[in-house]
Each structure stands twice: as structure tokens, then as C-alpha cells.
A protein has these predicted regions:
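Conserved nucleotide-binding/hydrolysis micro-motifs of P-loop NTPases
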Residues: 75, 87, 97, 104-106, ...
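Canonical P-loop GTPase G-domain recognition
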Residues: 20-33, 172-230
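Switch II of P-loop NTPase G domains
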Residues: 35-37, 76-81, 92-97, 103-133, ...
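Conserved C-terminal guanine-recognition region of P-loop GTPase G domains, centered on the G4
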Residues: 119-195
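Conserved G1/Walker A P-loop phosphate-binding module
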Residues: 2-107, 220, 225-229
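Conserved protein kinase catalytic core
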Residues: 33, 65, 107-110, 146, ...
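Hydrophobic aliphatic residues
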Residues: 60-64, 126, 189, 215
Length: 230
């Protein structure tokens, strides 16, 4: 009972600390679309199909279905830009920024042509977005990272971005399994000691506050165009 009460208190604190006044899907880009040149900074979320990106974004934004979720892998086939708290500067509110949902990769039944298009779309975004400040790589905490996860992590590093790994679906594991699973992710991605892994659950909202802290922290990082050599 005490654990439940502590969890409820943590959820209430996260909501108080990172209130959402406004959240809208502002831009949707396909493979041939021109990427927007946003003034507000961007943080991106990458991960394989069905890893829980849409659920995570909805949890961050305290919305049930702004980011469309589906049990069918490969649902997100575009780059989706969510504008958060436009011109908001008050304490206690989430910062004015964009959350960028990248297409899920590794969808087994997608054609080779479709997979290549998604790959080019993601790579182009990572390489060219001047507003991008941080990339969150989502990995299912229940499974070892896949070859696609490793390739995605390498893309992020090569683009000059700092990566943070989010271990999704933490509520699906027993507490005794958590440490072993996190070590499996760190080893599987060959992460350095400084690379952060955030356990996250869309069911309990655990990790919401930690992710928002890192999103806010990203606003003060070095200009992404300098990091990428532009």
C-alpha cells in the first residue's frame, strides 16, 4: 500500500512540474516533404515499431490519443512534429519545444523498399535538422536490443547528437528483473558509462518527470548546427 501511495505522489509531482497548456500536431512530413525550419528547439523519439513511442508521447503530454497508438506495427510512417506550450515561460510548465515522433523501424512485413524509405527519412532528419537538440532512443526493456536498435544508436552518435535511451514497458517486468534487463540493454547497445537509460512506463507514468527534465536540459545544450558541423 505504501508503494502505491509513493507512486501516486510521484505521478502528481510530475504533473505539477510539467503541466501541459497546449499540445498540437503541427506538421506531418513524408519521405519527399521539406522539413520545417522551426524556431523552437526539437527533441526526437526513435525506436522500432511497437516499442511504445506514441504511448510515451501521449503520457508526456497527458493526452489519451494525440499521438495515435496501434497494435499494428509500422503505423507511424511519417515524421510528426508536436508543438508543446508555444511561448510558455512560466515555472511548473513543460518548456516551449517540439516533440518529434520518427517512423518506427524494423517492421518485419514491410517491403524492402518501404524500409529503405523510412531509413532515408530518419537519416535525413538527423543529418539536417538545425533545431534538433537531443534524440531519445526507445528500447523495449523486456528484450535485448536488435540489430536495428544498434544501427539507430550508431546513426544518432554519428549525427553528433547526445542520445538518451528510454527503456519502455517497465511495468511488464517484475522488480527483480529490472537491473538485469537494463544491463542487457547497456551491453547490447555498447553504451558508454555516461549514456543515460531511463526506465519508463506509460501505464504508471514512471519516468515521465525524468524525461521532461532531460527535454528541458536539452534547451541549454550547444547549438545542434555546430555539433553537426554545419
Amino acid at each position: 500500500m505504501e508503494a502505491v501511495e509513493r507512486n501516486n505522489m510521484a505521478q502528481e509531482k510530475a504533473i505539477v512540474n510539467n503541466k501541459i497548456r497546449e499540445a498540437v500536431l503541427e506538421t506531418v512530413c513524408g519521405i519527399t516533404s521539406r522539413l520545417p525550419e522551426n524556431a523552437a528547439y526539437e527533441v526526437a523519439f526513435a525506436g522500432k515499431s511497437n516499442v511504445g513511442k506514441s504511448s510515451l508521447i501521449n503520457t508526456l503530454l497527458m493526452r489519451k490519443s494525440l499521438a495515435r497508438t496501434s497494435s499494428q506495427p509500422g503505423k507511424t510512417q511519417t515524421i510528426n512534429y508536436y508543438r508543446i506550450n508555444k511561448d510558455e515561460t512560466r515555472d511548473g510548465f513543460a518548456p516551449d519545444c517540439y516533440l518529434v515522433d520518427l517512423p518506427g523501424y524494423g517492421f518485419a512485413t514491410a517491403s524492402v523498399e518501404v524500409k529503405e524509405k523510412w531509413g532515408r527519412m530518419i537519416e535525413r532528419y538527423l543529418r539536417t535538422s538545425k533545431a534538433l537538440k537531443r534524440v531519445f532512443l526507445l528500447v523495449d526493456i523486456r528484450h535485448a536490443p536488435s540489430a536495428n536498435d544498434r544501427m539507430m544508436y550508431e546513426w544518432i552518435v554519428q549525427s553528433g547528437m547526445e542520445s538518451v535511451v528510454i527503456a519502455t514497458k517497465k511495468d511488464k517486468l517484475k522488480p527483480s528483473q529490472i537491473d538485469k534487463s537494463l544491463k542487457q540493454i547497456r551491453t547490447g547497445l555498447n553504451l558508454g558509462a555516461d549514456t543515460r537509460i531511463i526506465p519508463f512506463s506509460s501505464e504508471t507514468r514512471e519516468g515521465r518527470d525524468a524525461v521532461w527534465d532531460l527535454i528541458r536540459e536539452a534547451s541549454g545544450s550547444s547549438d545542434s548546427s555546430d555539433m553537426k558541423g554545419h
